[in-house]
Amino acid sequence: MTNKSIPLVELKDISISFGGIKAVDKVSVDLYPGEVVGLLGHNGAGKSTLIKCLSGAYNAEAGEIFISGEKVVINNPRDARDQNIETIYQTLALADNLDAASNLFLGREIITKSGFLDESKMEAETRKIMARLNPNFKKFDVPVSALSGGQRQSVAIARAVYFDAKILIMDEPTAALGPQETEMVAELIQELKKQGLGIFLIEHDIHNVMKLCDRASVMKNGKLVGTERVKDVTEDDILSMIILGKNPKDKG
């Protein structure tokens, strides 16, 4: 059983430099089971660079990473996957010409004893996971290029969850989606929370953060401005943190 008093993830005093410039400067953030933490800041604030230490895309030059209380080393995306960390990029990394099941198992196909693709098993497993995440999803027999933005997000999320993700990194999951599709993704995120996953949400839209997240961590110029529970702050407070680099709750 998951211990909710121990963070799923703790990034402690993480620092990364590029060409002598501190992209991330001693930043600490954490994430608990069943929680969504939004990461905000202008382009170049350091939020994506910070989270790429967790996904294995970058290596921190200083700091520590703890997963469920245990110190770990993440040198590459394979190390991240070994820690049940999955990333859903804005591009979704889906193969447009393949259907949902083929995308879900892309690179991790189920093979029969005879050495052939077990397409019926893969479709059955896809239907099972989609029934859990998005019961309204019915388009199993068409290429994902024919799906709406929200349906494509469903496939990308299902792929991560099927392969036992405990920690999900989502890069602007509602970008370029209409209101109805955005609501679909919001419902998916709520379902993932119920199942105990922890989600880091990289976002530019403050309204989405206030709606989808439990806490918001704001960065500016590579430093952490602050982390606040969204129910304790206003959108203007968050905007002030992004623009001014100061937390209105810090007096003096």
Predicted feature locations:
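Glycine-rich phosphate-binding loops of nucleotide-dependent enzymes
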Residues: T2-G252
